[in-house]
């Protein structure tokens, strides 16, 4: 039986682009991913993930999307969010009407925060993808922005952690947003000063339109 109360501690989270389910049959990859409390598998190209691969986790799915009308067309994108079973009682899925997004509301009792925290896991197809031929919104980051607004409309202004593969190149630029998750410790153990924005050092110095928009969204909702 899972306890409904825990002593707040560091929570581990990762986003990992698997480019199809075949990579999950590598034992070393599964061992690495299984260590995390929350593990977002990106680009599953599938509608499900075999549950026996991660017996210690519950699996939350948003299926891939066919980019053509052909029934035989391969699914594109797709997410699977693994949640360790001892954490699952502290997690509520928030259903949203967007492809390639998973939203969870995580209890303050797990994180030691004053409010629940929203996890928003995302895969954005690149700007050149034919996916955008079938949508009203041509900039994928604008979909994230609208999803955040929907969550705020439902739950108020909760702290939010955004993670995934955005196909957004930000170079060495950073947003003006600080880490404002309202807890007395760094829940992810990322830095000594959890409320500062670290200096980015990236080998990819290019900034694209998705990247600029993403930085603006981070600042907008800080």
PLM-predicted stretches and their roles:
Residues 1-222:
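A shared catalytic/ligand-binding motif for oxyanion handling
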């Amino acid at each position: 039986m899972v306890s409904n109360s825990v002593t707040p501690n560091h929570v581990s989270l990762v986003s990992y682009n698997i480019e199809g389910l075949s990579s999950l049959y590598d034992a070393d990859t599964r061992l690495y991913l299984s260590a995390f409390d929350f593990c977002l598998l990106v680009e599953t190209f599938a509608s499900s993930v075999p549950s026996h691969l991660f017996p210690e986790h519950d699996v939350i799915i948003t299926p891939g999307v066919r980019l053509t009308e052909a029934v035989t067309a391969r699914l594109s994108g797709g997410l699977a969010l693994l949640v360790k079973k001892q954490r699952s009682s502290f997690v509520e899925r928030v259903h949203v009407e967007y492809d390639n997004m998973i939203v969870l509301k995580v209890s303050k009792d797990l994180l030691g925060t004053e409010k629940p925290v929203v996890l928003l896991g995302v895969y954005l197809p690149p700007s050149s993808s034919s996916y955008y031929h079938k949508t009203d919104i041509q900039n994928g980051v604008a979909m994230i922005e609208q999803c955040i607004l929907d969550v705020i409309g439902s739950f108020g202004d909760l702290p939010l952690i955004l993670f995934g593969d955005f196909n957004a190149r930000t170079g060495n630029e950073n947003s003006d947003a600080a880490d404002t998750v309202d807890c007395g410790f760094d829940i992810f153990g990322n830095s000594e000063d959890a409320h500062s924005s670290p200096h980015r050092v990236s080998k990819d110095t290019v900034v694209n339109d998705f990247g600029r928009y993403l930085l603006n969204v981070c600042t907008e909702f800080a």
